[in-house]
């Protein structure tokens, strides 16, 4: 079981709600969800209005349907990202460091992507609202401004979340480097004998050398 991997202490501990709710990453994620809900609600509720000349409903952002669709889409998908709160709650129970790594990388990529998408959305909505004729907006002007404002706030909330997730990923990488042991053998260490090899315990029998030295030429016996 891995301990201390990716910014979390030991796996298998009991879940405590109060420390969980006070974690910076959980607070940032909650703000992201609230801002996304506000943007989606403003566009869906009062993002469409008719004009004095027609009863047909148009998007209040310069009658550009793409602006309303874009703001609603990223708001809904960002709200559905509340699934990562479940991951944050379950994360300390995951003992496999590889699973933790993939979850953190997925969270990091999603947070970075949504930071960029909120930036694009803020610029898009602001541009379309700037060229909107005020006479064409009978209702929904305040909601349009609120959608733009909280799109701007979402850039920073998702950026902070991406930064915190990167710190968690970096903590896991640093922990792996510190605990890594190089499996390559030390060149200064002598090789151990093969475990199945037999040890040669042969010893020279005693008196062999003496026997060899005495086995020289001997004169024949004299009769």
Swiss-Prot record:
Family annotation (InterPro entries): Marvel (IPR008253), Synaptogyrin (IPR016579)
Annotated region (Disordered), positions in chain: 197-223
Polar residues: compositionally biased ranges: 200-216
Modified residue annotations for Phosphoserine: 3
Residue intervals of the MARVEL domain: 20-170
Protein's UniProt keywords contain Glycoprotein: no
Membrane topology: Multi-pass membrane protein
Residues recorded with modification N-acetylmethionine: 1
Segments passing through the bilayer: 26-46, 71-91, 104-124, 146-166
Domain of life: Eukaryota
Pfam families: MARVEL (PF01284)
Subcellular locations according to the entry: Membrane
Keywords: Acetylation, Membrane, Phosphoprotein, Transmembrane, Transmembrane helix
Major subcellular site: membrane
Gene Ontology cellular-component annotations: neuromuscular junction; synaptic vesicle membrane
Protein family membership: Belongs to the synaptogyrin family.
UniProt name for this protein: Putative synaptogyrin-2 like protein
Organism annotation: Homo sapiens (Human)
């Amino acid at each position: 079981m891995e301990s201390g991997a990716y910014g979390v202490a030991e796996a298998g501990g009991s879940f405590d709600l109060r420390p969980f709710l006070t974690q910076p990453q959980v607070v940032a994620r909650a703000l992201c969800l609230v801002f996304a809900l506000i943007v989606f609600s403003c566009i869906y509720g009062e993002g469409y209005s008719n004009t004095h000349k027609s009863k047909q409903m148009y998007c209040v952002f310069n009658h550009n349907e793409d602006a309303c669709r874009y703001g609603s889409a990223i708001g809904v998908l960002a709200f559905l990202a509340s699934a990562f709160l479940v991951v944050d709650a379950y994360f300390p129970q995951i003992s496999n460091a590889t699973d933790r790594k993939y979850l953190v990388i997925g969270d990091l990529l999603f947070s970075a992507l949504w930071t960029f998408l909120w930036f694009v959305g803020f610029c898009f909505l602001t541009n379309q609202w700037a060229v909107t004729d005020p006479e064409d907006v009978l209702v929904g002007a305040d909601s349009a401004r609120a959608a733009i404002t909280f799109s701007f706030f979402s850039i920073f909330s998702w950026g902070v979340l991406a930064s915190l997730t990167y710190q968690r990923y970096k903590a896991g990488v640093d922990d792996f480097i510190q605990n890594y042991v190089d499996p390559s053998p030390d060149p200064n260490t002598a090789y151990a004998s093969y475990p199945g090899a037999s040890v040669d315990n042969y010893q020279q029998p005693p008196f062999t050398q003496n026997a060899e030295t005495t086995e020289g030429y001997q004169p024949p016996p004299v009769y």
